[in-house]
């Protein structure tokens, strides 16, 4: 099987990471290996890349793409939320020169119908990035309470019709369990009023995004990964994160802002008593986005935002 995945914001990633020839870099979401290959081409001597991915198909594809780099590549099957444990196992805590996290679903996962990520093809309601995980989209939709389904659609998909869609899902599953993406698309079309279905692209887009985030606990993984990644970096090391929707971007922006803060004392204190010092320097005051040319060539880049920070201590 050919693993098709175009690395987004590649030029910008290299620009903010500034790979040093003998540096050690970690790609927390190696995917097809596109970003890692570009980083490896900048390295020499003892320079190496550690690539993580929870999807075995992605890891196998990365292995094929990066095979020519030999032992300068270490591939590990793991969710990026476990960066701390992986780096500790390799004896590299506090020694990594740069970390990249490219969050979200890959082009390959979207194109592979049987994975159930896309609303454009009928397939099993799966949506797992790790095919060995217990929770599928079908299991969630057939077992979760109506209120929980509505919360997921509202919080993770920013879906204005979340409550109504959840009601329709629960009514439908009482007759027969939901098992196919096509069934879910039909339910969403029925739940959203005709006039509203014409707004903002495909009517199922937000629901599918929300379910994918919930099934894979993507926001929880990101919140765990960010502090672990910072700890894994050497002083002067850089953390770059590519996000694809506002929920992720807010988490990254907030984390960087928090770590960049200095004194936490009340403003009326004459001298600092807390001793807190900034842990990072923010490199991207505003998120970097793709060029018009990249967005035309790669639709996935249209919603991509890159933020980066450098570890001070």
From Swiss-Prot:
Q: What are the boundaries of the region Disordered?
A: 291-313
S-adenosyl-L-methionine as UniProt keyword: yes
Q: Which EC number(s) does the record attach to this protein?
A: 2.1.1.199
Q: Does the keyword Nucleotidyltransferase apply?
A: no
At the top of the EC hierarchy, this enzyme's class is transferase
The GO cellular component terms are: cytoplasm
What InterPro entries is this protein classified in? RsmH, SAM-dep_MeTrfase_MraW_recog, SAM-dependent_MTases_sf
Q: Name one Pfam family in it.
A: Methyltransf_5
Broad class of the protein's primary localization: cytoplasm
Q: Which terms in the Gene Ontology molecular function aspect does this entry carry?
A: rRNA (cytosine-N4-)-methyltransferase activity
Location comes to: Cytoplasm
Report any one BP term from Gene Ontology: rRNA base methylation
Record-listed S-adenosyl-L-methionine binding positions: 33-35, 53, 80, 102, 109
Keywords assigned: Cytoplasm, Methyltransferase, rRNA processing, S-adenosyl-L-methionine, Transferase
Catalysed reactions, semicolon-separated: cytidine(1402) in 16S rRNA + S-adenosyl-L-methionine = N(4)-methylcytidine(1402) in 16S rRNA + S-adenosyl-L-homocysteine + H(+)
Q: What does this protein do?
A: Specifically methylates the N4 position of cytidine in position 1402 (C1402) of 16S rRNA.
Question: Could you identify this protein by its name?
Answer: Ribosomal RNA small subunit methyltransferase H
User: Top-down, what is the taxonomic lineage of the species of origin?
Assistant: Bacteria, Bacillati, Bacillota, Clostridia, Eubacteriales
Gene field: rsmH
